[in-house]
Amino acid sequence: MSNFQAALDAYKNGDLIIVTDDANRENEGDLMLLAEKATTEKVAFMVRHTTGILCVAMTQERARALNLPLMVEVNQDSKKTAFTVSVDYKPGLTTGVSAQ
């Protein structure tokens, strides 16, 4: 089995995987998890062992349906990463970032 296939199988099973990009892009790794397999424990691990910024991939249509505008109107980032405004909300929580 190839490393790619092993990672894909682990991802489908709900395991955390690290995906790295090219040295000519950001030269970094992203800790990824299939959203439907997320648990409080896995999200807490991601928050603790990364920058704490969690991203969710979605289509432009879905972002619009959720009323999530782009973070900036004129994207000057060299990679043109299309971040929306940040969301961190759960009723009853008052401490900021939470894995719940």
Predicted regions and their residues:
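Catalytic domains of riboflavin
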Residues: 1-100
